[in-house]
Amino acid sequence: MPYVNIKVTNEGVTREQKSQLIKGVTDLLQDVLGKDPATTFVVIDEVELTDWGVGGVNVEEYRRRQS
């Protein structure tokens, strides 16, 4: 019973994109590991830019510094 948790920043990932991610990950686990899609769980969490850190700062600040 595979469980995959995908975390992305909350920047407008569409319902269609989420569906594609879920299907793609499920298919990959079936193809590579022989896992049953009926018992494969995929969860997508959207994280606010201020709640995701990189380089010691949140993503908003990190991007400001990069530009």
Residue ranges of predicted features:
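A domain-level signal for the structural core that forms small-molecule/cofactor-binding pockets
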Residues: 2-67
